[in-house]
Swiss-Prot record:
It comes from the Eukaryota. It is found in: Cytoplasm, Cytoskeleton. Keywords: Acetylation, ATP-binding, Cytoplasm, Cytoskeleton, Hydrolase, Nucleotide-binding, Oxidation. Actins are highly conserved proteins that are involved in various types of cell motility and are ubiquitously expressed in all eukaryotic cells. Multiple isoforms are involved in various cellular functions such as cytoskeleton structure, cell mobility, chromosome movement and muscle contraction. Its main location: cytoplasm. Residues 1-2 form a propeptide. Oxidation of Met-45 to form methionine sulfoxide promotes actin filament depolymerization. Methionine sulfoxide is produced stereospecifically, but it is not known whether the (S)-S-oxide or the (R)-S-oxide is produced. This is Actin, clone 205. The modification N-acetylaspartate is found at residue 3. Its EC number is 3.6.4.-.
Amino acid sequence: MCDDEVAALVVDNGSGMCKAGFAGDDAPRAVFPSIVGRPRHQGVMVGMGQKDSYVGDEAQSKRGILTLKYPIEHGIITNWDDMEKIWHHTFYNELRVAPEEHPILLTEAPLNPKANREKMTQIMFETFNSPAMYVAIQAVLSLYASGRTTGVVLDSGDGVSHTVPIYEGYALPHAILRLDLAGRDLTDYLMKILTERGYSFTTTAEREIVRDIKEKLCYVALDFEQEMATAAASTSLEKSYELPDGQVLTIGNERFRCPEALFQPSFLGMESCGIHETVYNTIMKCDVDIRKDLYANTVLSGGTTMYPGIADRMQKEITALAPSTIKIKIIAPPERKYSVWIGGSILASLSTFQQMWISKQEYDESGPGIVHRKCF
């Protein structure tokens, strides 16, 4: 499978970033924002070659004059025309391959509407003429990437978080829990609490600046109350950030107040459980005999689990919920930002997986519904 001629393409379409590359590689070749931007103003300069839309990094770099839209919200594709643009950009501009020559592995969030994966299948076969494709569940791929077949995965990206228990390679669908609280909500929350400091961020372009502040400066406190007290008493936790126009902004307790919303969604006005309780609830929905294995193999994946301190805090919170004699291990691989993609790369290059692909022929015979029969 190392030959690029026949290598499968692995495309992990996240709500925030699209990760794409070739099966068998150890990291994605292309990682770019899942954004489509359209000009906010009429072009005035002749011959500038203005386009009617920009995708990914190009949209990001011209964000000042564009309105940015994310076609994937909460892990579900909501704008198919824009999504096609992103796929087109992935194949032709980023990977520079002809999609009709490669099998394509796509990923999706668990508990997604069935119509979503049918439409994905249809577009791959009818628009891009792919010879074969497959749709895999993101969290399952993360577990593969960590070299396990049993464990509970907390996969938290930009648009959706979910906890998926997997036993001997099988996801247990009745115990999957989904939490519509993820990176984008934290970015919005940080925008809101920075406003309290007198910094105003409102446009879609400014939201990207706040996302950068979040990624560079935020962390999870081990003890929130104590950290708040420290922040109030001294300036030791303050950090500064230089905005694109040279202004310098200072942020203090916002650094840990923002990701604290993962553990206390009430900060965002949400009534759901925090991520620690969600993991615990997922484990409790599983058979009593396998819980011990799940507690000992709790795997974090996705960009929103990248905050410093999150693994220790998870350990502390789950220890408080679980029976006292049980061994709890939180696995936070350093490459977890891309572990879904890496798992897809592993899966698509397994010799045993080759009979799992949905071929163009099968699609022509059965239609898009085949995806529910062939892909778990």
